[in-house]
């Protein structure tokens, strides 16, 4: 007679010995000063962002500008131009690079792009949030040398980008206005000013590309 022999192994479900999976979030390192020049857009990229041709660098700086004595009131300095020393005073920034560009002697387009280095992402964030509170305090301003008057036509925040449009009063045809954009990425602030008869969102496009350049650096 045949004998049925039962196996000695358990007939229950075996316990898994596989360790649970974990997801690690990589935190980008702070950028350093030598990486700043590579964050700025080329003239060709600025051309594309502004819808023009022949943009060329007319000024390249390794420090912030000071035009505080050419306009009033002071609370509008951040809206009037990019990379202003008084705007960044006491912010804890470490270094800056900027390019100014236009498309010739009788230029119809102007751009300034600045990148400002902070020691940590937290200090860059603090400056950005302070700017988000300060920018709305400006409504109108004037250039004291030329006597031109300007007003803020638009001002909005989209995540980590501040954007504004300022318009010169009585500029004559076809008009003159400037786009402003401030972008936060890691420990870098990108600060952009673009001016033309119709700046649109050209400053935002340049700022977004600066942000992408920051994100590409690890």
State each model region's role.
Residues 9, 15-99:
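N-terminal "mature-domain start" segment
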Residues 4-7:
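C-terminal motif of bacterial Sec signal peptides marking the signal peptidase cleavage site
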Residues 193-218:
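Surface-exposed amphipathic alpha-helical segments
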Residues 91-128:
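A short acidic-to-branched-hydrophobic micro-motif
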Residues 109-112, 174-180:
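Short, surface-exposed coil-to-beta transition loops
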Residues 118-123, 154-161, 186:
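A short, structured loop/turn motif at beta-sheet edges
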Residues 111-114, 183-196:
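Short, well-ordered beta-strand elements
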Residues 61-64, 129-178, 217:
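Short Gly/Thr-rich strand-loop-strand
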């Amino acid at each position: 007679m045949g004998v049925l022999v039962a196996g000695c192994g358990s007939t229950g479900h075996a316990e898994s010995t596989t360790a649970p999976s974990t997801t690690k979030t990589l935190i980008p390192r702070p950028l350093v000063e030598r990486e700043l020049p590579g964050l700025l857009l080329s003239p060709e990229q600025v051309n594309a962002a502004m819808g023009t041709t022949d943009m060329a660098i007319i000024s390249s700086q390794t420090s912030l500008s000071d035009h505080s004595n050419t306009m009033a009131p002071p609370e509008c300095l951040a809206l009037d131009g990019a990379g202003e020393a008084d705007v960044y005073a006491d912010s804890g920034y470490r270094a800056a690079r900027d390019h100014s560009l236009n498309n010739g002697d009788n230029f119809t387009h102007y751009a300034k792009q600045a990148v400002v280095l902070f020691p940590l992402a937290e200090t860059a964030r603090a400056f950005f949030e302070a700017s988000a509170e300060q920018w709305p305090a400006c409504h109108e301003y004037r250039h004291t040398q030329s006597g031109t008057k300007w007003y803020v036509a638009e001002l909005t925040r989209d995540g980590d980008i501040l954007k504004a449009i300022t318009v010169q009063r009585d500029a004559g045809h076809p008009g003159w206005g400037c786009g402003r954009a401030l972008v936060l990425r890691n420990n870098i602030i990108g600060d952009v000013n673009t001016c033309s008869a119709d700046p649109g969102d050209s400053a935002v496009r340049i700022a977004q590309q600066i942000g992408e350049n920051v994100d590409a650096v690890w």
